[in-house]
């Protein structure tokens, strides 16, 4: 029985390490991108197939969904440059983005509250269209009379100005009585027949969602018919925000995702875009492209005809791959008819930013699940809520991990205490077990009978030593995904040399401390009588120290605190058991 208990503990540890490594490659791996030809400047090229197919429209879209003729360095040049005059610059407290007036696509987004890397002051680039990468948010009106389906190409919108900031915003009072600064960027396109299309982007200070609205004023003599579309288009370039450290490469999930009322969260890998195409209709759905810590998503909104109140519309959600291997997640609205002399408004929300669960949950059902904690999400969710609670009090994620670990140990204390008490008794009877092995070692049946009698007499359960580890492993794994998936912990410092809890310890100090605590903890456990088992258990602290060298510092911190509390708990229990045994022996003496 004792041998089986030790193998169970050893097996649980190896299974945990194996699951972590397997998860890196299985759920979060992705196919390596095919090499792409790069040029100094991305010029417009024919991607007509990138437009979604309109319903009931006897037209062929000869237009393009163009790439901005601009590089990242040129975007950072002066506003008076020839390139920047083609684009509309919008700067809020959260975004610095550029809109191409041809088609009204967002061709670059910089997230001002998130740095490119820990040691960089450059903002994280969410969307871009340059020699390195194509990743844009597109929208427009397609169909029979949609300007984006015109044979002459996508519409060139007129703009009032080419640079907007929050200084151009207006104060708006919401229904809850709060005042917000709201910035609206209008783009106008007029047809010779008298149809006016106003495409507007609305930004609210402090909020990531962008409202993209198309208003059609039909002053012509004929009925106008079209559909709104919104899509995210991305090439197969690598994730700029992925983690890659040491001998292990953390391949975070990069791919499509979508949700509907009856299927809240679904992944769709880029490699499966051709074989598992998304094509479904939903009211209240969404489409997204997910990467490490960040997500971009289209959420279809409301349709308003003439003076009627806006109502949510049923949108077609779809995925496809273009002729030039661009991955597209998008939606199209139903066909909209605007009789002569009337108007309509149709909108959608675009989210392009960090995966903040509270904000995503308010936007659409299931969108917050892009923060993917895997199959242990119920435990991970509780751990994250606990971390948030402590962080709101002390303002440091490292100390929050320590306090959360203490709380978890207190909750598990009664169960673990019972297990450690049994292990302490095993430690006390170890000499007697060794004597029995020497006496009955050749007779396995007699040895097993004597051992069972000893366990029963001393009220010892050798398998109970597995309980603490079995309780800790799900928490350990869940906390790993919390550290890897929660953008709140990205670049979060603790103290001293630990300036990023989601990355490995740069000096390997915490893993070495963890190895010491594991060694001390082993010394408090009953030692194996089998020489081979003893050798394996002696090298386990070394093995786990090597594993932990490349794990997030926050996870190693959790394990150190957990081991330290366990050592104290086990030491006191061992002393108590030894004292009780001495008290039993003394009267009989």
Per-range role (PLM):
Residues 1-410, 580, 584-589:
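Membrane-protein biogenesis/insertion across secretory and organellar systems
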Residues 8-21, 476-479, 512-517, 539-543:
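Core hydrophobic alpha-helical membrane-spanning segments
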Residues 214, 341, 411-477, 518-549, ...:
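Membrane-interface amphipathic helices and adjacent TM-edge segments
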Residues 395-397, 547-556:
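Transmembrane helix interruption/hinge and helix-loop junction motifs
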Residues 478-520:
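Conserved catalytic motifs of ABC-family nucleotide-binding domains
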Residues 501-504, 508-512, 548-552, 564-568:
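Hydrophobic transmembrane alpha-helical segments of multi-pass transport and channel proteins
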Residues 514-515, 555-563:
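Hydrophobic core segments of alpha-helical transmembrane domains in multi-pass membrane proteins
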């Amino acid at each position: 029985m004792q041998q089986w208990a030790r193998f169970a503990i050893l097996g649980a540890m190896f299974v945990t390490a194996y699951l972590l490594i397997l998860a890196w490659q299985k759920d979060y791996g992705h196919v390596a991108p095919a090499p792409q030809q790069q040029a100094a400047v991305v010029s417009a090229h024919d991607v007509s197939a990138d437009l979604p197919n309109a319903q009931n429209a006897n037209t062929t879209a000869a237009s393009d969904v163009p790439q901005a003729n601009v590089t990242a360095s040129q975007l950072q040049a002066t506003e008076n440059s020839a390139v920047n005059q083609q684009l509309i610059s919008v700067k809020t407290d959260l975004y610095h983005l550029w809109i191409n007036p041809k088609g009204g696509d967002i061709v670059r987004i910089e997230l001002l509250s998130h740095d490119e890397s820990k040691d960089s002051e450059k903002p994280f680039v969410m969307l871009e269209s340059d020699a390195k990468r194509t990743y844009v948010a597109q929208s427009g009106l397609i169909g029979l009379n949609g300007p984006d389906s015109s044979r002459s190409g996508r519409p060139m919108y007129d703009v009032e100005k080419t640079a907007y900031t929050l200084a151009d915003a207006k104060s708006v009072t919401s229904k809850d009585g709060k005042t917000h600064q709201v910035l609206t960027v209008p783009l106008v396109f007029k047809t010779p027949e008298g149809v006016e299309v106003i495409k507007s982007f609305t930004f609210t200070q402090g909020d990531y969602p962008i409202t993209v609205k198309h208003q059609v004023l039909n002053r012509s003599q004929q009925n106008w018919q079209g559909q709104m579309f919104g899509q995210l288009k991305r090439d197969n370039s690598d994730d700029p925000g992925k983690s890659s450290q040491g001998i292990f490469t953390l391949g975070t999930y990069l791919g499509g995702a979508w949700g509907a009322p009856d299927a809240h969260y679904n992944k769709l890998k880029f490699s499966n875009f051709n074989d598992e195409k998304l094509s479904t209709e939903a009211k209240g759905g969404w489409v997204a492209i997910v990467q490490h810590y960040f997500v971009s998503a289209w959420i279809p909104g409301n349709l308003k005809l003439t003076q009627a109140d806006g109502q949510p519309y049923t949108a077609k959600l779809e995925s496809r791959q273009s002729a030039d291997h661009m991955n597209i997640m998008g939606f199209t609205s139903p066909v909209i008819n605007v009789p002569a002399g009337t108007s309509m408004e149709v909108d959608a929300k675009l989210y392009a930013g960090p995966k903040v669960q509270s904000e995503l949950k308010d936007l659409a059902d299931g969108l917050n699940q892009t923060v993917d904690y895997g199959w242990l999400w119920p435990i991970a969710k509780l751990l994250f809520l606990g971390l948030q609670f402590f962080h709101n009090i002390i303002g440091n994620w490292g100390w929050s991990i320590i306090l959360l670990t203490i709380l978890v140990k207190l909750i598990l204390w009664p169960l673990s205490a019972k297990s450690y008490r049994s292990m302490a008794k095993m430690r006390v009877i170890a000499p007697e077990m060794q004597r029995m092995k020497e006496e009955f070692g050749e007779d396995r049946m007699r040895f097993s009978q004597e051992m069972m009698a000893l366990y029963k007499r001393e009220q010892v359960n050798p398998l109970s030593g597995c309980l603490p580890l079995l309780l800790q492993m799900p928490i350990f794994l869940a906390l790993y995904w919390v550290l890897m998936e929660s953008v709140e912990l990205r670049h979060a410092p603790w103290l001293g040399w630990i300036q990023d809890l989601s990355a490995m310890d740069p000096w390997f100090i915490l893993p070495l401390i963890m190895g010491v605590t594991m060694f001390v903890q082993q010394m408090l456990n009953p030692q194996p009588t089998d020489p081979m088992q003893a050798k394996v258990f002696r090298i386990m602290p070394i093995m786990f120290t090597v594993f932990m060298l490349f794990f997030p510092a926050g996870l190693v911190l959790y394990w150190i605190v957990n081991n330290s509390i366990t050592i104290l708990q086990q030491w006191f229990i061992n002393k108590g058991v030894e004292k009780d045994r001495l008290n039993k022996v003394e009267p009989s003496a």
